[in-house]
Amino acid sequence: MDLPLRRLTLANGLRMVHLPDPDTKMVVLNLLYDVGSRDEQANCTGLAHLFEHLMFGGSKNVPSYDGVLQQAGGRSNAWTSCDYTNYYDVLPAQNAATAFRIESDRLLGLRLDEEAINIQKSVVIEEFKQTCLNRPFGDLWHEIRAAAYQVHPYRWPTIGITPEHVANA
C-alpha cells in the first residue's frame, strides 16, 4: 500500500506528518509530546498524567477548550503512556484551522493557576481511586510493572504509584 504521506519540519522544530484521506470530510489533528511517566522520579509520579488533564483546563484566549471544539463540530481526548502523551482532535475538515488555533493557544498560554491545578489534582486522584483502589485487582498492574522493571522508570504506572504524589505536587 502506497500512502501519500508527507513529512515536514517547521522552522520552530515541530515535526508534522500529513496523510490525506479523500474518503472522509473529517480531519484528525494528533499531537504527540515526547514526555510520559518515564520522565518522572520514583518519589513524584503521576505528574505526566496530571499535566495531560491540565491541558484541557483552558488557556489565556480559550477558556473552554472543549466548548470551542464542540462548536466547530469536533471532539478531543488524550492519553499518557510511559514514553509520550498523545492529544487528538477530530472535527470537520473545513474547521481544521480551529483545531490548530486552539492547540497553539493552549501550548503557548495554558491556564496553570492554583484553582485549575487543584481541580485537576482532584480529578486525577479520583481516577486513581476508581481504577486502582476501588476495583478488584486494581493494583495488580502496579505489582506486575514493579516486578518486570525493577530499576527502570517503567516500573511505575502512568497514573502514579500513589495518589499522594499528585496531591503533593
Please provide the spans of the model-predicted regions.
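Short, structured secondary-structure elements
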Residues: C82-N86, Q120-E126, P153
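Hydrophobic face of alpha-helices
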Residues: A48, D66, F100, I117-K121, ...
